[in-house]
Amino acid sequence: MMLNTYKSYTERAEQHPNACARSLFELMERKKTNLSVAVDVTTKKELLSIADSVGPYVCVLKTHIDIVEDFDKDLVAQLEALAKKHDFLIFEDRKFADIGNTVKHQYEKGVYKIASWSHITNAHTVPGEGIIKGLGEVGLPLGRGLLLLAEMSSKGALTKGSYTTESVEMARRNKDFVFGFIAQHKMNEYPDEDFVVMTPGVGLDIKGDGLGQQYRTPHEVIVESGCDVIIVGRGIYGKPDEVEAQSKRYREAGWNAYLERVRMHKA
């Protein structure tokens, strides 16, 4: 049987057990995009401006809300409005990494109240399976989805080998809430599983940034490695006057790579 990785997003949406994943696949097919833009800026104005510019071209907007120096509740309200306007999901790249009881409060409470507005979040598996249980207590009733960090794109990352293997096993035991991974290649091994893989470190023009980040092309990520969503940051918003043009460029490259993958594996 064909792995779900190689099926169309529509087919995967129809059979996926996770509500957040279904919404994502339907959105990707509807907008014809597998692009996520990582908006790592430090002011409310910049974040909202970039979100509005890239919104028409992305399936997911990835935020680091805790680096925004002038964060307030209005920022969240405006982000939610932009998500509705442009039809995208919000992914707060929080990378939770504490025991279950602590992350539960970090996710639901505090200044940011992440669970109330972010459709997707992620976590390290270093603390063990309790982190998934804790986040799930908050996120599952809200229809949220969790990604586990199985692999990272930075040079020298320790997320490999048995760490990655154990992360996948944790995901298999928690499919109601965990719908995928931050990783560098597909994680599906069996016909009855369908993990979404979102991949950072995607660039069309450069191979690294001097701080350990390593870049691959959309073709390498989608076709050769079997990933599903390309995450692009500075390659899109690094030149303020080219944000829309670069968004279109990466969206087209990512979507064409997806179409090529589907064609290659058609029965």
Swiss-Prot record:
Its EC number is 4.1.1.23. Keywords: Decarboxylase, Lyase, Pyrimidine biosynthesis. The active site is at residue 95. Substrate binds at residues 40, 62-64, 93-102, 215, 234. It comes from Phycomyces blakesleeanus (strain ATCC 8743b / DSM 1359 / FGSC 10004 / NBRC 33097 / NRRL 1555). Belongs to the OMP decarboxylase family. Pathway: Pyrimidine metabolism; UMP biosynthesis via de novo pathway; UMP from orotate: step 2/2. One of its GO terms (biological process) is 'de novo' UMP biosynthetic process. Pfam families: OMPdecase (PF00215). It comes from the Eukaryota. PROSITE patterns: OMPDECASE (PS00156). GO terms for molecular function: orotate phosphoribosyltransferase activity; orotidine-5'-phosphate decarboxylase activity. This is Orotidine 5'-phosphate decarboxylase. It catalyses: orotidine 5'-phosphate + H(+) = UMP + CO2. PANTHER family: OROTATE PHOSPHORIBOSYLTRANSFERASE, URIDINE 5'-MONOPHOSPHATE SYNTHASE. It is an enzyme of class 4 (lyase).
